[in-house]
Amino acid sequence: LSGGIDSPVAAYRMAKRGLALDHIHFASPPYTSERAKLKVKALAQKITPYTGSTNLFVVPYTKPQEYIRDNAPDVLFTVLMRRSMMRIANIIARKQGCEALVTGESLAQVASQTVKALQCTDAAQDLPILRPLIGMDKEEIVTVARRIGTLETSILPYEDCCTVFTPK
């Protein structure tokens, strides 16, 4: 649950199909603020009517992110960060008895969401990855977010760990 528009919609769509969900959020203080974490908690609350009771795991991600930033070429930063997140999510999911990971990715919405990039992040762990938004465009996702009541919270301007170190 990143704090953006897509992940709550992905959770909603999977809950609609009967999937029980836990959420994982990656926080990178001091680069991400307490307000950003509160935003994610608010989003988790807003989708509770659809998902039922869930756990929210907040993963401190500053050190891995700094390590990748300091040691990887800029061109690989995003894919290496996503692979690292997938590995961590896999560990948490297995400990919780989860059978799959769910992401809010949609194909080719951003450069890290090409088929090749998705294959690369998938290969970092061994659970099935469900992507309920894969064929949706941003307008369709925003329409669902508005309908389920998450859009206004999702667009609050707090930083998330996926963008704070993105190479310029």
Predicted regions and their residues:
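ATP-dependent adenylation/pyrophosphate-handling site
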Residues: 1-38, 162
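A short alpha-helix-loop-beta-strand transition element characteristic
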Residues: 149-157
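A conserved beta-strand->alpha-helix junction
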Residues: 43-71, 158-161
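Small/polar glycine-rich anion-binding or flexible loop at a beta-alpha turn
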Residues: 107-109, 157-165
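Active-site adenylate/phosphate-handling loop in enzymes that bind or generate adenylated species
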Residues: 65, 71-143, 147-148
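Structural beta-sheet core signal
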Residues: 23-25, 58, 103, 131
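Conserved active-site and cofactor/substrate-binding residues in soluble primary-metabolism enzymes
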Residues: 9, 35-42, 59, 76, ...
